[in-house]
């Protein structure tokens, strides 16, 4: 009987290990925070349709700050030990530049367009789920009884959902004083707080898989006026047709029609399935493409899908 119970316990342990190993974890990318970039002047100007905005210059930061690369590498190792897949910024940017075949601004035949920042493009092309932002400051300190000159580091980690840009997990702390180099001091401080950070990430990702990803979905028409959302099909206005489709294809019919006119509809907090029927990860573009095909096949309505990052998509009706 004891041998039977022992065998049963061993089988249960093996099953738990297998489940832990096969549990899906989000894909991550580690980047410096806005504050870190600004404090070290790693910023640049971006022209957003005539309006100049300041954005982080990650490429210059990784190229010129050797400490940053070491810090990101150390944190990447910690996250990998928890089973996360970590994408490398420099490698992803090199791949993006090699296959750059479209402009940052996509234009229709009629001259309409959508702007996308370099960070939006990175998220869309590299397709990672969570962005880990690291910020740290170095303080002068003394070490040991002999009061040897050293330093301590206070840090903040933030996990950002790349689909919504919402902060979904945080961690902060202060290291003990040390004479080690900053990346090693920071590694120890982050490691001491990693368990809680990992728990926050795991709970959030479990919720996504159960309740769906959250995206923003915009429907609008071209200026040509070939079609509008009040046009009727089989007695229903087009906006009602689209809402019916949204109800059938979102997780538990969850979405919010925040604004609607005859030329534009804004759907927010749209919960899309985590995977499509083929078991592939679904993003905003693939979800909108399903509606585009439905409108084309059922109502002969042409439309074009435009994206901004991973979590915002625009379906423009009336032409391609």
Segments predicted by a language model, with ranges:
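Amphipathic beta-strand/beta-sheet edge segments enriched in Tyr/Trp
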Residues: 130-179, 310-319
């Amino acid at each position: 009987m004891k041998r039977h119970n022992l065998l049963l316990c061993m089988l249960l342990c093996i099953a738990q290990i297998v489940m832990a190993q096969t549990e899906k974890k989000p894909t991550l990318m580690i980047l410096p925070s806005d504050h870190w970039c600004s404090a070290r002047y790693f910023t640049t100007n971006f022209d957003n349709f005539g309006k100049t905005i300041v954005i982080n210059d990650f490429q210059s930061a990784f190229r010129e700050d050797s400490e940053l690369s070491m810090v990101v590498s150390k944190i990447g190792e910690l996250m990998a030990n928890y089973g996360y897949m970590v994408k490398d910024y420099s490698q992803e940017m090199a791949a993006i530049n090699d296959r750059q075949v479209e402009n940052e601004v996509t234009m229709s035949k009629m001259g309409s367009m959508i702007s996308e920042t370099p960070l939006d493009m990175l998220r869309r092309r590299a397709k990672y789920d969570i962005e880990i932002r690291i910020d740290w400051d170095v303080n002068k300190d003394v070490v040991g009884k002999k009061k040897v000159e050293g330093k301590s580091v206070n840090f903040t980690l933030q996990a950002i959902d790349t689909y919504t840009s919402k902060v979904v997990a945080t961690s902060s702390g202060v290291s003990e004083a040390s004479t080690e180099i900053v990346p090693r001091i920071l590694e120890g401080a982050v490691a001491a707080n990693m368990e809680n950070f990992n728990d926050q990430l795991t709970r959030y990702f479990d919720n996504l898989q159960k309740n769906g990803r959250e995206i923003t979905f915009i429907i609008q028409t071209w200026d040509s006026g070939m079609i509008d959302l009040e046009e009727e099909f089989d007695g229903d206005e087009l906006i009602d047709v689209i809402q019916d489709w949204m109800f059938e294809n979102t997780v538990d019919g969850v979405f919010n029609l925040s604004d609607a006119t005859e030329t534009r509809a804004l759907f927010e907090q749209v919960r899309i399935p985590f995977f499509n029927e083929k078991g592939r990860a679904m993003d905003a573009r693939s979800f909108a493409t399903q509606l585009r095909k439905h409108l084309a096949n059922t109502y002969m309505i042409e439309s074009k899908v435009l994206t901004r990052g991973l979590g915002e998509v625009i379906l423009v009706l009336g032409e391609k």
